[in-house]
Amino acid sequence: MVHWLADKGKLKLDENVANIWPEFGVNGKDQIKVNHILNHTSGLHNALAGVTEDPKLFCDWDECLKRIAMAAPETEPGRQLIYHYLSYGWLCGGIIEHVSGKKFQDILEESIVRPLNVEGELYIGIPPGVESRLATLAIDADDPSRLAPKAHPGIPSSLTLTSISNLIALLNILDGRRAIVPGGNGHFSARALARYYATLVDGGVIPPRHPSSSLPSLGSHPHHPMNKKDENQNQNQNKEDTTDEVETTIFVNPKAKIHDAFLGTGDYKNLTLPNGVFGLGFSRCRTAGGSLFGFGHAGLGGSTAYCDINNRFAIAVTLNKLCEGALTGEIIRFICSQLDLPVPLKYVGST
């Protein structure tokens, strides 16, 4: 969504966040730029670290934005890449709202949900009536400790087994599912998430509708089930549209420039740490030999999605029984072997 706004000329990726979000420019954050946040180098990796212990705060979007605007960085911006875990979503969310003048969820609908026709299958904070279609998150009971993050300089100190357990509990309660937590409670079907990456792999060109054999048809679920007007509009949108008003792309700039922005390459190479795990908003996919071939992002407990730029391939794996990712690796290796595609280094030989 930040890239969508940048593509429209609403912000620059090397712009100071405080120019966009004045309240943010305090406590040593006046030199933090948008690219520092997208590259996980802003120093705010532990901001709001105790939020999973405070359900009321966790579910209060506006209060979380206020508090993160007051946070102080722990490292100099642009110097050290440390994964921003939950703080990333509030940081990007604040930028999105201040740049656009609109609410986060309105931009989500405008930039992704409606153009891609994934109504009812892609949410960050669910509306009333969707909860009956959601899976319950569970930890692999065989060895829950395997979910604990491995010690690594790029992992924040606040990301612990306790914080993960607290987060899972919050995401299984209704208030937690209705909250806007972009860094933690995206609710997606695998096909909606794969469609999103299929759009990105082609530089924003929206793929054709899914075949009729894919049931229920994509976009057929009521997006706001308790809103009858919305449900009727959703049904009308799913009828074959032959007008010239149908969107064909979500970006204006050429595909190569869009991909460079995602990966932090080309004109954007100075906005990221060299050879870092992350580009600008996405993790970089490399082969075992080190060749860069795509981008994506893994989620908690094995869920993941990525795309292969060279082969125009996108995949999403969504799990509700959370484990350390061995099953995900098996799925990805099998599919890549069948299609003769490179396997991301993260999943090469994972067990």
PLM features: residue spans?
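Active-site-proximal loop and beta-strand segments within enzyme catalytic domains
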Residues: 1-86, 94
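Residues at or immediately flanking beta-strands
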Residues: 16, 121-123
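Catalytic loop of the DD-peptidase/beta-lactamase superfamily, centered on the K-T-G motif
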Residues: 80, 85, 97-115, 123, ...
